[in-house]
Structure formats: C-alpha cells, structure tokens
Amino acid sequence: TPPAGPDVGPR
C-alpha cells in the first residue's frame, strides 16, 4: 500500500 497523506511524492 502506498503512503497516504501529504508526505507522498518527491520532496
């Protein structure tokens, strides 16, 4: 399962 929330994707 991919991480949910605003901490997803490149920083």
UniProtKB/Swiss-Prot annotation:
Its main location: secreted. Coiled coil: none annotated. GO terms for cellular component: extracellular region. Keywords: Bradykinin receptor impairing toxin, G-protein coupled receptor impairing toxin, Secreted, Toxin, Vasoactive. The keyword Secreted applies. Expressed by the venom gland. GO terms for molecular function: toxin activity. GO terms for biological process: blood vessel diameter maintenance; venom-mediated perturbation of signal transduction in another organism; venom-mediated vasodilation in another organism. Transmembrane segments: none annotated. Belongs to the bradykinin inhibitor peptide family. Bradykinin inhibitor peptide antagonizes the vasodilatory actions of bradykinin at the B2 bradykinin receptor (BDKRB2). This is Bradykinin inhibitor peptide.
